Amino acid sequence: MIVLRFDDIFDMLNLYPLHYTLIRLFSLSMEMRIIRDKTPDIVIVDPFYMCAKILGSARDRQVASSYLEGVILANADKDNFLVPYFSDDTHCTLILLRPKYSMAMYFDSDRQSKKDYTTIKKVLDDALPGYAKYGGTFRRPIRRYGKHVFTHVTTFPCVKKPPGSQKDAYYALHHTRAIVRDQHHRMLTNDLKEWATCLSAIQDEDIRQELFRIQSEFAEIIYQDVLPSSGQLYLNCQPSNSEIETTLQMQADNDRTFMTIRKDDGFIHAPVPESSQKY
């Protein structure tokens, strides 16, 4: 179960920074589409555990590594695993894992990124030994201190957002959509660096239109898959308040109220909007 706040849906409809619960919804919807369309050789990992605020303890990091290891082993015939990673509630980087090649490529949309990837690097690296132990194959194994690890490329070429923009998550979804689209049409080449360099040459007007398409797709997912009883993501029961509170705690989203009431009895739904020029 995912608990979505109306505040966050309101943010999405106004192209404000996206909360990670919405990215999880989008990712699960895309993965179902990949399965339905039989898009070859690619998996989107459920990003439930891939959030810095959830990875605070060694035990939590081990749970995340074990989960990722299980996903990779369950899809041993696949080469490409897409992992949305959240350094905080609204800042997201897409990581493309290729376990057989021991490669982890970070599609970081910041032009001068200062993100600390230490924690997620350890989580990813700790998933590889189990993959190797239980029959995972490598075409290019990398070992450090006798242990299988990834080569982490945190400066991989990708579309960059303008200075001051807070739309990391939209860019992560743009990269996700591009990878899945080209993989579906079998245009994703083995030379991923060359492919990504060509992708990064997108024009400003095109990226603006892409953000609007992502916004529209969010609306379609909610309207077609979440709300109707026939939807693939419809929850066929009414959760109790305690179940909602438990889910909020599990998804590390229990540190804020649903809505903040202003003195004039209105509601604060979203932050001050960014300049319309910052996409």
Where does each model-flagged region fall?
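Cysteine protease-like catalytic core of ubiquitin/ubiquitin-like
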Residues: I9-L13, I34-D255, K263-Y279
